[in-house]
Amino acid sequence: METNLGNNTSSADYFAETSSAYDAANIATFGIENTGVEWKYTAGYRDGEKKYIIGNSSRDYSVSTLEGINNNPFEGFQPIVDIHSHPSTQGASEHDMLNAKGKNGVSFGVYFKDNKTLYEYNSVRSNLNSIKMNSMLDLMRYTFRKYNENDEEE
């Protein structure tokens, strides 16, 4: 697993990139279920290969976007799944929806650990669909389904 550490204006960001869907889903699920900070799980492509980025910003109220990390360590990464956790609220915030604006082809979601539900959203609606996510295997299945949908569109 390649690790990257970047700083933004308010705190340190801790993110890592891997080619292993299992490792990414396992670490993200463990972090979300066992901490009170927001986590990010992103799946996509870099240099034509499937990649997964996970991380947190050590804050309970926000997590950095990949573009918000100094020195842009994930340059060239093309996301198809962009999920982050909300420890205390369901659905996307206005800020989440603003971050989704203009990013076509990406499935955005907020995971709420209290009810183990993923809330899909876009730049217009904070709750398009709700999907139960009882384990890391559910997260992996969701991700693989989105990879397949993306491959069919190309």
Each model region followed by its residue ranges:
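A detector of repeated loop/turn-to-beta-strand junctions in beta-rich toroidal repeat architectures
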Residues: 39, 103-105, 115
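Sequence context surrounding c-type heme c attachment/ligation sites in exported
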Residues: 105-111, 118-120
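Glycine-rich short-loop/terminal segments
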Residues: 1-79, 124-154
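Structural recognition of the beta-strand scaffold that forms the well-ordered cores
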Residues: 41-42, 80-84, 107-110
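Short His-Asn-centered micro-motif
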Residues: 55-56, 83-87, 100-101, 110-114
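Active-site-adjacent loop/helix micro-motif of nuclease/hydrolase catalytic cores
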Residues: 64, 89-98
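Extracytoplasmic/secreted cell-surface and envelope-processing proteins
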Residues: 52, 90-94, 117-121
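Histidine-centered catalytic micro-motifs
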Residues: 78-92
